[in-house]
């Protein structure tokens, strides 16, 4: 059978400005052992990363990006364009007490196959501390350490990123995200 007529939708992505104002004392500037250019670049990089992380996760969309967690949420089975689908964890305000890793398997396969290839996990450090203890039915941890110096740790073979702008475990919170954020 033929597919229906495709429709296109124009999306607007506004460019916003971020800035940093690193402070260096005269003593630091005069210190020949300190690579001031490298130090300043590092300070600016950290500040930009913190601002961008907050904007992309919780931003209001007013003079900044609209954050991932500000979109309407719907149960994944009822997914609609412009919404974020979710999978329940099995616990009221936390992960299920038995087999908590099952929610990760459910979330992994809830994401359409075309998006799984470039997908990664996103959570806070506090939630990651809980996740690292989850095991499968054979006693293997779901979390795996990096396999090389620059490689990320993984869950179910997909990279894990942490950002403390993600919410804590709790009722009606979405403490873990999984998707191809480059295509989101």
Which ranges hold each PLM region?
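Structured, hydrophobic secondary-structure cores that serve as assembly/anchoring elements
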Residues: 1-184
